[in-house]
């Protein structure tokens, strides 16, 4: 309605957003959803879905859990909206590694629903802490959203458990501030994925302007931080805002400048 040429969309609600995507595409707007799969078909409902390798993230988390908990673990997994493709695929990834029954998934299945909302994440995690006397590992695909709830472990007289998650400066600094008082609080992160949208924007702009379309159609990132591996230290930048993602290609300083 406003005459835009290209639209990049994070369809966090999944298939519920498909009609809106299709409407934009049929109106001639270059339409590029990214990250969460909205269903539908490229060339029919939108131009291209730019995904991410969430299965690989899950495998990375699974390998880390297996290495650090060889005797098994009780695992609590938190993701976004119910049924979102990101959480489902991540679960498939780490379950492909954690095949032994000694690795027990607790909480709602296949994951605790948080809508990636920090307030709801805090409510969900607080309830889980009260319900489960043993939580060995928390898996979260939006790690920074849990920072407000993690102190509930200490209030209950328990160490914050090990955590595999997506990165964020606020999470890294929380770990730095609390690791000494919480002996079980190991942390491994994968990139939160700011560069996933970078690739989606590159596709949208190229297609709308007749430019060179990128050859990559999906984004993936390696393990970013691992408190058990000196080669991948947890990186807290107290001189920068907490809401930054140091795994991104854009520097923390440039991100901070954009947020002013």
Kindly give the residue locations of the regions a language model identified.
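A residue-level marker of the well-folded mature domains of exported/periplasmic proteins
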Residues: 1-260
């Amino acid at each position: 309605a406003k005459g835009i040429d290209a639209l990049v969309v994070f369809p966090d609600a999944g298939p519920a957003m498909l009609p809106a995507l299709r409407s934009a595409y049929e109106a001639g707007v270059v339409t590029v959803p990214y990250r969460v799969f909205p269903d539908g078909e490229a060339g029919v409902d939108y131009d291209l879905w730019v995904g991410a390798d969430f299965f690989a993230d899950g495998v990375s988390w699974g390998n880390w859990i297996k290495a650090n908990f060889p005797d098994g673990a009780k695992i609590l997994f938190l993701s976004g909206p119910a049924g979102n493709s990101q959480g489902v695929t991540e679960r498939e990834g780490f379950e492909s590694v954690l095949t032994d029954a000694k690795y027990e998934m607790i909480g709602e299945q296949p994951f605790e629903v948080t809508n990636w909302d920090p307030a709801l994440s805090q409510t969900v995690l607080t309830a889980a802490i009260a319900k489960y006397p043993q939580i060995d590992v928390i898996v979260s695909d939006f790690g920074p959203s849990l920072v407000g709830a993690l102190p509930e472990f200490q209030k209950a007289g328990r160490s914050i458990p090990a955590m595999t998650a997506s990165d964020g400066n606020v999470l890294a600094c929380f770990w730095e501030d609390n690791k000494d008082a919480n002996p079980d609080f190991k942390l491994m992160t994968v990139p939160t994925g700011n560069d996933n949208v970078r690739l989606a924007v590159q596709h949208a702009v190229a297609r709308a302007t007749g430019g060179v379309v990128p050859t990559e159609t999906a984004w993936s990132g390696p393990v970013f931080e691992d408190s058990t591996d000196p080669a991948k230290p947890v990186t807290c930048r107290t001189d920068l805002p907490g809401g930054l993602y140091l795994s991104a290609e854009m520097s923390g300083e440039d991100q901070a400048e954009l947020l002013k």
